């Protein structure tokens, strides 16, 4: 197999995994439901069945699905947010999709986001773009500031793990670790570009009056993801460190130490009339933190 074909195969694995992940997050495949058979997915995406299998391995490694021979592939996780407000506490956990649905019901949306790759955000933005195109919501303005880790950052993850008969892989210049980080940067570039293009396209078509997107990079390895909306709400949760298989662009699968953004347990806080309440202090504190990093450290 030539190099270009191998790279293309990796891109197809990424494309299929991204699409299926978005469907799960968007509710097309609810918790406990089964994905279509692999043969059907291969036909739909116009790829080889082996590509579908590798994409499913990616989702399995992220904790979205589980597969059992003869039983199909079942969804075992959806992105949920536990609210700290009295109203939502009665309703229990809500999905991140429901949270963004409510946010985009407003005429103006101001989003400040601190994240590793913006993969989750891209999924939610695509869903809201569809709602806007379907005339289900009609916001006028969207302003997004996003903080991402600088590519020059020597982050402790992702990192290739040694096999049973291999020496320890603890050097930052280890070949597989370098390739893992290149893959991470590719994912970040893809998702941030997709977010920018999606929102600016809505503005170009007149479906948004204004779309302002600004992205800066900071030399801080994310240990949590943070969404701040309109200065009044905060959603945050820690990243989970885990060992999992990762498919590289040349389709090689390696064992690695990584974080699983989609596995975060997100908490939701809403400012109220009491500036000293736990929720109000939480939102204000994290907004101040974001602004300080944006102004003094990010480039």
Model-predicted segments: where are they?
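Extreme N-terminal segment that seeds HTH/winged-HTH DNA-binding domains in transcriptional regulators
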Residues: 1-39, 43-44
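Short, cationic-aromatic polyanion-contact patches
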Residues: 12-13, 37, 71-88
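Short helix-terminating capping/connector loops at secondary-structure junctions
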Residues: 31, 137-142, 205-212
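PLD-like (HKD) phosphodiesterase/transphosphatidyltransferase domain
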Residues: 80-170, 273-275
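Amphipathic alpha-helical interface segments
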Residues: 227-299
């Amino acid at each position: 197999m030539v190099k270009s074909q191998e790279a293309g195969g990796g891109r197809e694995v990424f494309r299929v995994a991204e699409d299926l992940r978005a469907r799960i997050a968007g509710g097309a495949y609810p918790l406990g439901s089964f994905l279509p058979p692999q043969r059907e997915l291969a036909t739909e995406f116009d790829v080889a069945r082996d590509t579908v299998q590798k994409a499913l391995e990616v989702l399995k490694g992220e904790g979205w699905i589980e597969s059992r021979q003869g039983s199909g592939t079942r969804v075992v996780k959806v992105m949920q947010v536990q609210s700290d407000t009295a109203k939502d506490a009665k309703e229990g956990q809500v999905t991140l999709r429901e949270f963004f649905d409510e946010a985009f019901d407003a005429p103006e949306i101001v989003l400040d986001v601190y994240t590793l790759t913006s993969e989750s955000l891209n999924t939610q933005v695509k869903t809201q773009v569809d709602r806007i195109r379907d005339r289900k919501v009609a916001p006028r303005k969207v302003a997004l500031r996003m903080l991402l880790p600088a590519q020059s950052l020597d982050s402790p993850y992702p990192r290739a793990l040694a096999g049973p008969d291999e020496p320890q892989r603890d050097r930052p210049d280890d070949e597989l670790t370098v390739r893992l980080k290149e893959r991470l940067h590719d994912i970040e570039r893809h998702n941030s570009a997709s977010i920018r293009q999606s929102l600016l396209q809505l503005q170009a078509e007149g479906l948004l009056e204004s779309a302002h997107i600004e992205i800066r990079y900071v030399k801080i390895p994310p240990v949590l993801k943070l969404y701040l909306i309109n200065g009044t709400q905060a959603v945050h949760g820690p990243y989970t460190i885990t060992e999992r298989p990762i498919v590289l662009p040349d389709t090689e699968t390696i064992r690695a130490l990584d974080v699983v953004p989609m596995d975060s347990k997100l908490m939701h806080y809403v400012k109220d009339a009491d500036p000293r309440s736990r929720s109000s202090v939480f939102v204000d504190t994290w907004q101040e933190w974001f602004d300080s990093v944006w102004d003094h450290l990010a480039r």
